Amino acid sequence: MVGRIGYVRTLMQKAKRRFLIALMIPVVAFGCWLRFDQLAQAKAAPINWRDALKQPREWYGSSEALRIADNLIAYQRESGGWPKNIDMAVDLSERLRSDVAKEKRSDDSTIDNGATYSQMIFLARVYTLKQLPRHKESLLRGIDYLLRAQYDNGGWPQYYPIKKGYYQHITFNDEAMMGVMRLLRDVASNQRDYIFVDEARRERAGKAVEKGIECILKAQIVVRGKRTVWCAQHDEVTLVPAPARAYEHVSLSGQESTGIVEFLMGIEHPDPRVIKAIESAVAWFKSAQVKGVRWVETTGTPVDHVVVADQNAPPLWARFYEIDTNRPIFSGRDSVIKYSVAEIESERRNGYRWYTDAPAKLLNRDYPAWLKKVRPGKKWL
């Protein structure tokens, strides 16, 4: 009797375990599904437009990339270009999409702040992976826009259609013209994201790049017989250095000139004029180093940016240098030139990039490598 009771009890315990396991299976399965769903959502989480060109190659074939590419088509103006300072990765509601459509005829297409050429790079990556005709059509319209916008002398204005004021100057500021030229160079050289571009456009892109290089060479600033670097803007007719906003004076640019030299060093078979332009600019960068200081952000409230002495600091370069004296210059919204960044108002001191270390990579790595390839045997001091 006792044995039979124990046997029954054992059966009941096994049945209980099976029942509990049966209850747990859907719970565990739901937990796993939730975990996988969370991972999928995290992987496909919306991104900011600032990060749109920083994604892994395969991401440009994702549904999120397709959504953003379609946003870019929505934002593209009838001119073929795009406006600036808009987060075009934001999910467009029906109302917002309707508002965007109303701006199609706006004349705010620009190459400032990465606009237009950045959208085109994105579209090219998506089209390469997905092959959707609407993305190709949008990109080709963008290429046509850039080709139309170029001045006869090879430069590009900040806005096209032309916007009166400093916007019509040839604009190196913030990589504007160099961003355009890098893209057109990729088109002309049949790089993998642009192999679908027709031969006629490729040929026109190549000629536009050649004209742009000619413009750069002619615009290089000569001081007392020596070639130096470039201003952030140059006059669209005379090619002389030109001012822009109140705090952006005629000057030698320590920042924008870096991108120009990097582009010139990318020319496969540079002629003597290009080589001379590069070597002259590099010599200027070496002479314009600001040593023994750091440009730091304070920890107080409000935050401030200050120059502090530090003999062990790596070299810096000022954003702008006075052409005749080669002294760093700074300015506030009153447009008065100062020789110390501490002398301008807090708003401009903290709201603008007055120093850069970008030329360090040029001097320490890129130029020596270029020199070894183009001028073997020449020693870089």
Locations of regions flagged by a protein language model:
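Bacterial N-terminal signal peptides
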Residues: 22-31
